[in-house]
Amino acid sequence: MAPSRRKGGGKAAAVAAACRKRKVGDLVLAKVKGFPAWPAVVSEPEKWDASPDSKKVFVHFFGTQQIAFCNPGDVEAFTEERKQSLLTRRHAKGSDFVRAVKEIIESYEKLKQQERASDPKSAEEGTLGSAENTTLMPQVIEIPTATSLTQMNSDPSHGRDESTLLNEDASAAEQMLALRDNSGPRNKACDSAVVKEPRKIATYSSRKRNGGVRSQNCAPQNETCPVQRSKSPSRLQTEKLQSSMLQNSDGGQTIDDVEDGALRREKRIRRSSGHSESDDVATSSLNSHGSDEENASEIATVESDNNRNEGNGVDSGSKVEQIDIGGKFLEGDYDLNKGLNFQINIMVKRKKRKPTRKRGTSDVVDPQAKVEGEAVPEAGARNNVQTSQNSHEKFTERPCEENGDEHLPLVKRARVRMSRAFYGNHEANSSLQAEERSPKDTVVSATAQTSPSDIISSHDTFAVEESKFFEVSAKLSGDMVNVAPSPVEKSHDGMSPSEACVQTVREREYAMGWNELSKTPDDKSAGPQYNQVSSLPAGEAQTASVPEAVCPEVLKLLTSESDLPAVQYCQVAKIEPSMDPNTVDSSANNASEICSLSIPSQLSGQDRSNDQDACVSLENSREYLNEEGSKIDACVAQVVQSEAIEHSPSSCLVVNKQETENMPKTVNMLLKEGHGSLGEECAIVEPAQCTPNLPISATESDVIVGENVPLNEIGCTKCEDAVEDSRQLKMIGETNDQKQQVQTNNSVLVSENLSREKMSFSPAITADTPARGTPHSSSVYYHISTSESANDMQNNSSGSPNIPTGEKKNDCDAIVKEEEKIETGVCQGQKVVSCDVQSTRESYEDALCSLVRTKESIGRATCLAMDLMKFGVSAKAMEILAHTLESESNLKRRVDLFFLVDSIAQCSKGLKGDTGCVYLSAIQVILPRLLAAAVPAGATTQENRKQCLKVLKLWLERRILPESIVRHHIRELDSHSIVPACLYSRRSARTERSLDDPVRDMEDMLVDEYGSNSTLQLPGFCMPALLKDEEGGSDSEGGCDSEGGSDSDGGDFESVTPEHESRILEENVSSSTAERHTLILEDVDGELEMEDVAPPWGTENCTHTDQADNTKVSNCQLGQQHRPVFGTSHQHMSLSSPPLPSSSPPPPPAPPSQQGECAMPDSYLNGFENGGYRNVHGDQQAGPLRMNPPLSGSTMHYQGPESSYISGVQLTNSIPQADGSNFQHRPYPSHPHPHPPPPPPPPQHQFSFREPGHVLKSHRDAPSYSHRSHYVPNCDERNFHDNHERMRHAPFENRDNWRYPPSSSYGSRYQDEHKAPYPSSSYNGVRWDNPPRQYNNRPSFHPKPHSEGPAPVGMRDPGMWHQRSD
């Protein structure tokens, strides 16, 4: 019997198989609990000092640079489908995830490009297929002659068999020459070829992240061109090296690892001895590990020094040179920092050229200049012709010298032929190339000059508009081409500045056709070259100048992606005669190309406007190139920088905007710091001439136009000066940058697009520096634009601001190297930051749009805001938040957003140091806007106001913001909460009223819910707010506004209304108020005796709660005075009064007797109560109505106004129902009753007194008095009239009788009968169909058994009337 299989055995085997399926370097999506499937790459645990686990897959996550062991089931391969899905869903998952997606996509594209590079056919096809991502390969750009075309056709085989190409010395040289000769056609072809097969310079975009991609892209291009193939192999190797370096930077690998693969590729590429110097140069350049003497060695390593020295390796010379830089750097076992690999590569160890080789000869420049220069001459010549006639003439002379080129080395021969071809195709090619070339390509290094004199020191003209232009920064890198080659080289690279520029322009244009060649080497050496450019900036910047005429072409060139590699190549081609290394050669080639675009105009003395124009077009192209071609620029800059480091101080002088952007080196730092923005900075820092200009331009953001100064004149001193100037610019720029960038913060704002636009021609800067691929200039802008990044800018500054002009080139080189190192880190960091900022900002905006009042949502948005603060854009984050809050229509969400502000503030408060103050200061400045948006004016925002007050009080308690500021805003919110009560009738929203609020019964009445329409009827009468006093119930306040009580809530109203039971009064009424009211009642009792003589109307003086004395005297007098006025007949009054609302009951029948008139019927009281008097009125209403001295029938009419609120007439808006409340609260004396011990006196109000004889019962009270408070001063009625009736005279008196038909007699109201209490039954007056519910169950008046009518308000004691006795 077979043994039973162990349970789970198959599962374990499956797991192991799945683990084995994943290989190191595979791109995957790994799922970790709590996170989405995260982009990662399979790595080796050993590299991270972790013990391997056979059952798990060890991955390194992109974006966060974290590692983890994942189950095989949680790891899935990264495919094209997954790529598309991630692109659509990345923005809602945070900045880290967005960054991770970008990185894995770049790596994915890089791997695909590497595969294509390894397979020439696939590489060529791939490059053609990915035109949008790549710039045209030199081969594509160039339209070779029939031979060159044939060679190009055979290029795939050559690319396939690079070693074969290298071995074919003569054939390769011939091919190179033919290709260059046909560079003009190629340029034309570039126009078409660019479209046909853009080389995978798209890897340049990858280069943004890692230089390896650039080199890889360059490799396919190199394969495309046979002549370039010599470079191509090295390029491929360099690209691989760079790619590995990039991978190392991304994956933490060291350059050594990269070297291994790259060196192997380089070793595979052997150049034949017959290749002559160009081959030797290429080989030497490829032999980055070998010395210059070893250039003849079989291994073709890229060494820019050798290339420069030899100038023989035309194709490989410039390109290989760039590769050399990377190789050298690798060779030097330098560990490339992530994102800084290329820049560090710039630090490539320079190897001494072979003693046999001439540093100053054109040969030095020729290796690169030939390969690149030949392609460039025509392209560059076009530009140069436009820019500088001299350079063009010299260039022309060179071709003449090269007519019999058989005796010339292959490289020189190729150059001569290229130049001739260039002249033929100059016009057509220049336009085509201009279109094809990217802004970076447009950046033309100054002509590679044979000697310092040849080097043209001219400043880059930066677009005066900082935000729009980074004026041909590439000029610097192009200018950095300091070539002291043989006369032939001079014709292209070694020519005098003007000549070099001309030829450079030609080469540039031709090189635009040969951009592949220039790009490839540049790309490969982009990292190192970029660093070289950084080192070169001081010296080569002098030579580099963007010709105005060239600039237009440059603009054209910049327009096309393919141009970018050429420009970069040109920059790399920057070669000084002093620069012996191969980098010089590659720089020379690149420089010539760059010069062709940038230098000629300046050499020809054209205006900066051309440069600026070129910059404009370059900016446009650059935006595109930044995505794809920026890598090329970085490569070029690196090559140039390495050259500058190795060779002359003139390189130190070179400062390109794009280079500064792409190059994290001194130049970039200087530009960044000096100008605050690349656009502001001068691309070129001339040794002596540029020195003064640069600081100015840095401050003024103006384009510094440097004069063309030969390297000979400039010399080391100028290089030193340039370095010094650059440093000064850095220091000056640090301050200016901060200011200017803050000013141009909108344009800079770390937006990749803006940074791309601002980035000048310099390819290296825009392309390589940031591992993220964000334009370096943007990073610079970002840092400069924010004070928070100011420190970074300061750190960017590399050396001391001033360097003695007497210093030697070595000093300059050392300084430049240091600056390059610094700038490399800074630029890359800035690019990464820029990309991070953009993604974080998008995530932040998404979080604001989807914010809800939950801890998770607010916490996530807070974290994103903190991330933005780290990037230095806290002010922008708060601006976005304020804008979102202001544009939010939902009031509830406004509170949510304000809670986010609170979260950010408290989180910032918890931070240590000055970082916590960043947001707090921003919040403090923008807080008024935030509060105005969160709590807009209106009565419907009370909830928002409450929540904001809570937040502010919490801030006050925790001292989040200065106490004075917080208290100020709290007071404002409090005032806003009070104002609406006064401005908008104090009626609370229906939903805010308590269920037992009598207002609910009055909803259909025209009077307000508190039984008064005084607010509507007394427009000129200012009613003070009683929100706070309702509880206190002061007479003055109550008298001021019958609505004062209405403002209060139902409970408040009850507590203030004197009709409430004593328990309520005790709860809500202050003792002092109660005492005061008690005195008033006693006085009122005393005044009841005076009522006989005085009319019941003590109006004027009793408008507000009067003290007892005032009420006694003034009320009586006023009553007498106004008595005749009010003593109109009820009928007359009713006629003049407004009609009753449809819902109001008919007026009550007249009381049976004058006693009835004198006494208020229960129904009247009820009606009055139903009138909805609130606390203010109710303060005195609560007291029993007291009978005043007998009055004529007219007095009954006067009491009518109180009841008129309930009468149909009084219900109308015209009837001031508030009068009733005033009446109740008037201090006017009512019947003195021996019994009525006044209950706890309610708050005094103007309505505390009523008209004598008017016994008012709240509309709310039922007919029975048992539910009402035991007393209310009858003077309330009088007071009622005082406040409101005086405003409305006779017409309102009708209200008094709304329950009583007007009595025929107008005699004294007070008769003997009326002295006796009137039973409620004595009133036949009309009452409401449904007696209003008692207000908060307050007891109504308790009629005495013998009472003939309702007890007067003033006499209302618990359950009984107090009849006045004579």
Swiss-Prot record:
GO BP annotations listed: chromatin remodeling; flower development; mRNA processing
SMART domains named among the record's database cross-references: PWWP, RPR
Compositionally biased residues, Acidic residues: 1032-1052
Matching Pfam families: CID (PF04818), PWWP (PF00855)
Keywords (A to Z) from UniProt: Developmental protein, Flowering, mRNA processing, Nucleus, Transcription, Transcription regulation
Domain CID: 836-977
Any one of the GO CC terms: nucleus
PWWP domain segment(s): 24-81
Main subcellular location: nucleus
Region of interest (Disordered), residue spans: 111-138, 203-319, 384-403, 427-451, 787-808, 1027-1076, 1128-1366
Known function: Probable transcription factor that acts with partial redundancy with HULK1 and HULK3. Plays diverse and essential roles in the control of plant development, physiology and flowering time.
UniProt-listed PANTHER family: HEPATOMA-DERIVED GROWTH FACTOR-RELATED, PROTEIN HUA2-LIKE 2-RELATED
Name of this chain's protein: Protein HUA2-LIKE 2
